[in-house]
Regions:
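Catalytic binding pocket for nucleotide-activated donors in carbohydrate/polymer assembly enzymes
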Residues: 8, 73-200
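Conserved catalytic-core segment of nucleotide-activated headgroup transferases in glycan assembly
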Residues: 14-95
Length: 200
């Protein structure tokens, strides 16, 4: 019969798992920091993180074994010996003052699961600038975007010094996730509604 309906959908988050936790001092100590990234090593994201560390930004990484070769690279770079899963993953996205969102270059990604998981968990997201990211979140109001290491550094410096602005943007990003139905349930609901409208 062929395809009767096609629609591209964005990444989504699980509302019962990705939501803002109340964090203790221990949570912030174990899982937080100035700038953080949770994820696998890739050359491009590694280059960006090393650029930040080389210019005085403290970055903490939870990831796979390939990050370990940089463990003693810089006093500004804290490489943990494990990734994060379960509740600690969601907590960390909020515990960092700035949570970085990198895209897989080999996949030509325009967005990733962290594009919605970070703001859904109440985190302040700094992500690579793409058309899809800009469609999902209003730039400088619901998320912060960058297109170069120089811009990334400039914005990290600025927002580390402006806590009120960080919190306002994080709150707006969370609200956008909720009101735009970026959850798994919301995404399925919107797809089904679109299908029903098409076949009427």
């Amino acid at each position: 019969l062929g395809d009767v309906y096609k629609r591209q959908v964005n990444n989504s988050y699980e509302a019962k798992f990705h939501y803002p936790r109340t964090l203790s001092k221990d949570d912030y100590d174990r899982l937080g920091g100035d700038v953080g990234f949770v994820g696998m090593w890739e050359k491009e994201r590694c280059d960006s993180i090393l650029y930040l560390a080389n210019h005085g930004i403290k970055v903490r990484i939870f990831g796979n074994k390939q990050w370990q070769k940089y463990k003693n690279y810089s006093p500004n770079l804290q490489i943990e010996d494990h990734g994060l899963h379960s509740e600690d993953y969601s907590k960390s996205l909020k515990a960092f003052k700035i949570s970085l969102c990198f895209l897989r270059k080999m996949n030509f990604d325009q967005q990733t699961t962290r594009s919605v998981e970070i703001p859904a968990c109440g985190g302040f997201m700094m992500a690579e600038r793409t058309k899809e990211h800009q469609a999902m979140f209003e730039e400088n109001k619901e998320a912060i975007f960058f297109s170069s290491n120089e811009e990334l550094l400039e914005k990290c410096k600025y927002y580390l010094e402006h806590e009120k602005e960080r919190k306002k943007i994080a709150e707006a990003g969370l609200k956008r996730c909720q009101t735009s139905d970026y959850s798994n349930e919301g995404m399925i609901k919107n797809v089904l509604n679109s299908i029903f409208q098409t076949i009427k």
